[in-house]
Curated annotation (Swiss-Prot):
Gene3D superfamilies: 3.30.190.20, 3.40.50.790. The gene is rplA. The keyword tRNA-binding applies. This is Large ribosomal subunit protein uL1. It comes from Cereibacter sphaeroides (strain ATCC 17023 / DSM 158 / JCM 6121 / CCUG 31486 / LMG 2827 / NBRC 12203 / NCIMB 8253 / ATH 2.4.1.). One of its GO terms (cellular component) is cytosolic large ribosomal subunit.
Length: 232
């Protein structure tokens, strides 16, 4: 069994008995315990009372965090002509059509977000088995299939976070860097939780929001009080 370092052990001990605390207290605890040699991300995990195997219980959406994510987002855009030029001017990292499709098919995926104009979807659709499992498939429901390429690229670069419920009814996302001020992280947490609440599907039955946990990339997690996790 691998040895646990003193710093890691003391960080874990600080979390004992600290469940269901306020977002502010949780963020302060996590910031204090963060000990990695890089700027860790504050992770939010939400347990929802849904079964995403049923179409009417799927939860997905997008939210722009008030204080950004602190992450450099690489954006690929499928577009031609004037829309391709618009994407480049807006700051897209990769812009193309058939050439971009071939690059992706070769296994080279050097982007975090994929946007497409509607006319490109027959082409992009061929990449479903590659982009789908990576949650990179453009989708009109989250604004990544659009003619307003400029706004989509700027949103992706400016703190927009997509979310989609997983098989076990869990949603997770990074909502900022541990170097952020504590109040900015708390604001981002509440913006994210509020967005997931707004995305509650019609088919959800019983308790929708069951649990919200926060953690750093390398650290232990702590459950927060649900009333503290939402805006009042």
């Amino acid at each position: 069994m691998a040895k646990v370092g003193k710093r890691t052990r003391s960080a874990r001990e600080a979390f004992v008995g600290k469940d269901l605390i306020s977002v502010e207290d949780a963020v302060a605890l996590i910031k204090q315990a963060a000990s990695a040699k890089f700027d860790e991300t504050l992770e939010v995990a939400m347990n929802l009372g849904v079964d995403p195997r049923h179409a009417d219980q799927m939860v997905r959406g997008v939210v722009t965090l008030p204080n950004g994510t602190g992450k450099t987002v690489r954006v690929a855009v499928f577009a031609r002509g004037a829309k391709a030029d618009e994407a480049k001017a807006a700051g897209a990292d990769i812009v193309g059509a058939e050439d971009l499709m071939e690059t992706i098919q070769s296994g080279k995926i050097e982007f975090d977000r994929c946007i497409a104009t509607p006319d490109m979807m027959p082409l992009v659709g061929r990449l479903g088995k590659i982009l789908g499992p990576r949650n990179l498939m453009p989708n009109p429901k989250v604004g990544t299939v659009t003619m307003d390429v400029k706004s989509a690229v700027e949103a992706a670069k400016g703190g927009e976070v997509q979310f989609k419920v997983e098989k076990a009814g869990v949603i997770h996302a990074g909502v900022g860097k541990m170097s952020f001020e504590a109040d900015k992280l708390a604001q981002n947490v509440r913006a994210f939780v509020d967005a997931v609440n707004r995305a509650k599907p019609a088919g959800a039955k019983g308790t929708y929001l069951k649990k919200v946990s926060l953690s750093s990339t390398m650290g232990p997690g702590v459950s927060v009080d649900l009333t503290s996790a939402t805006s009042h």
